[in-house]
Regions:
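Alpha/propeptide regions of enzymes that mature by internal proteolysis
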Residues: 2, 9-17, 27-149
Length: 149
């Protein structure tokens, strides 16, 4: 039978090891280059990823590659998942959401309920790069997008 004394003693021992474990650094794996993923499978994969890979192959910026690849889907009227071909809400209005994140700086930007703009990923990137905000929604997101071209 465990006593309270034994429980507290064991708890203290666990608590003392946490700082030791926290100071252990993970060894990063060797970078084998960027990875761009597409959840659209074989049918859409090459179409979506090729523009991004072309940018990276010419020593372009990773965020440019991600944005351009996202724009392919957003601008395709036959893709009903996001963007121009996105399905309207219950009021018959297409509202789009997007977010973008940049690992090295931990910066991010996002928009939601964006109307009348075909490339929400590009607007999300503008939010990340040109504001102190992380998330802009609705009419505010639309006004921001129009203000930035």
């Amino acid at each position: 039978m465990n006593s309270r004394r034994k429980f507290i003693k064991n708890l203290t021992a666990v608590g003392a090891t946490v700082p030791l474990v926290a100071n252990i650094e993970a060894k990063p794996k060797k970078n084998k280059g960027p990875v761009i993923l597409c959840s659209r499978g074989e049918v859409w994969g090459e179409k979506v990823l090729k523009p991004g890979w072309d940018i990276l192959a010419n020593n372009g910026k990773l965020l440019d590659a991600i944005e351009v690849s996202s724009n392919v889907t957003e601008l395709d009227p036959e893709d009903t998942s996001v963007g121009y071909g996105g399905l309207p809400n219950e009021h018959g209005v297409v509202q789009l959401d997007a977010s973008i994140m940049y690992g090295p700086t931990h910066n991010c930007g996002s928009v939601a309920a964006l109307e009348g703009i075909k490339t929400p990923c590009s607007v999300a990137r503008l939010v990340m790069e040109r504001t102190d905000h992380i998330h802009i929604v609705g009419k505010g997101a639309q006004n921001f997008a129009k203000l930035h071209g």
